[in-house]
Structures are given as C-alpha cells and as structure tokens.
Amino acid sequence: PISDQQTPQSDVMQMDHSQHHQLATEPQPVVQQKQSSSDGTDHASHIKEHGGQVYQQTIFESKWLRNEDGEGILKSEFETRIGTDENKVFIKIHADQAESQQAEYDAKLLYSRMLSDFWDVQAGLRYLNNQNREVDQEQVGAVVGIHGLTPYFFETDAYLFVGQDQQVSFTLETERDVLLTQKLIFKPYLDINVIFSDDSNYAKKSSLSTTQLGLETRYEINKKVMPFVDVAYGYNKGSEETAWQQHSSSKNERLYGGGIRFKF
C-alpha cells in the first residue's frame, strides 16, 4: 500500500513545469461538478425541510357488521394518498354490500392543499355506483371539504357534496385513537350524513339522514396489520316515496362485528 501511494507522487515530481500555465488557464469541470453536486444536495435538503418531500400511504380496511335482527353488511374502505406536506392527491373508495344485494360504491378523487399545520382544504369529484337500482345507477358530483385534526387530536373529514337532481349533502367523519397499551388501542368514532336537498328518483329524507356512533378496539400486530372488533349505534331516517321506491321509516339499530386493517 505504501508503494501505491508513492507512485503517483513521484510522477508529479517528474512533470514538465512548462505545462503549468496551460493547466491554470484550462477549465476545471471536476471542481464545477462537485460544486453543482453540493448545490443539488443543499437544494434537496431545503425542500425536505420545507415540506417538499414526496411520500405515499395506502390503507385498506374490511369489516363485517351485524344488527340485532341478524342482518349483515360487509363494509370495505380503500384510501391512498401521495404528495408533499403542502400538496397531495387522495383517492378514497367505500364499498357497502348488504346480504343478498349488490355492492354500493362511493369513490372520491381529491386534490388536497395545506392551509395550516393541522388542516388541508380538499376539492374534487365524487362517483357513485349502485347496481341495486333500476335507473340512475351511476352518478357524478362535485365535492369540497377539509381534512385535519381538531383540538384533542380528533382526525376529521368534513365534505359538502353537490350532485345531479339537486342533490346537496354534507358528511362528517371524526375519530381518535386512545392508547391502552402500545398495541391495544380504543378508537371512538362518529359518522354523520346530512341531506339538504334531494330530487332524485331514490331521494332520501332531508335533514339528519344517517348517524353511526361507535367504538373500535384494535390490536396492532405491527404497524401494517391491525385486526379489530367494532360495536356501534346506527340511525337511518329513511327514504322518500318516489316512482322508483317506497317510503321507508326511520330505524335505530345496534351493530357489532369485526374486521382487519392494513397500512402500507
């Protein structure tokens, strides 16, 4: 190793000194490249410090709930988000399938812009699909809302929807994790749906349409796999009578079941 280090040094000693002026006046790309590389590293660090780092998260959840009459429903949710702290894109898909019926789908594509450290404003499109209906199986509307944390760290989504046939509605979803241990966690939650107007062929009654208040208890096998049990109280005001559906009365029910959630 010593001789290897000495060899290039002896070559330098034998260099023709008449070349010094030429070397001094020629461009030095290696030095410039190092400076450019250093500037790029500093710029990347600056972006990360100011919320410019791109990240992605996907959550999939599926649960089976049953009411007091033994009627069951499979509820599945898929959510993925990608972007920076300031700008993100959300894709949210909800699927509900009652026993002996086709699934109902609710999909949203949202652009999310940071308002503050705890709140984003979101806007986008909503797509509904219900193959149980004879007409109006597919509908598209606009959505605007907010996503973030309230005081006491309740994660909250609040959206206003405007769709076909003068359908205007509002939804609120809020939840919070309460740690019992590092792996056993309570999650109280509240889901509310308010109908302001609905002139569709399958109109729902206006004002408070549905409510679900529940408590989820989950066990985190790890940060990616989380089975849970769920108990809840549900309220449904019912539907208006139209040419395509019969009038239905309000309904209160207790729900219980379980499911599993994946994060990756």
Where are these regions (language model features)?
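Solvent-exposed loop/turn segments connecting transmembrane beta-strands
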Residues: 65-74, 96-105, 128-140, 161-171, ...
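Outer-membrane beta-barrel initiation region
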Residues: 2-101, 113, 131
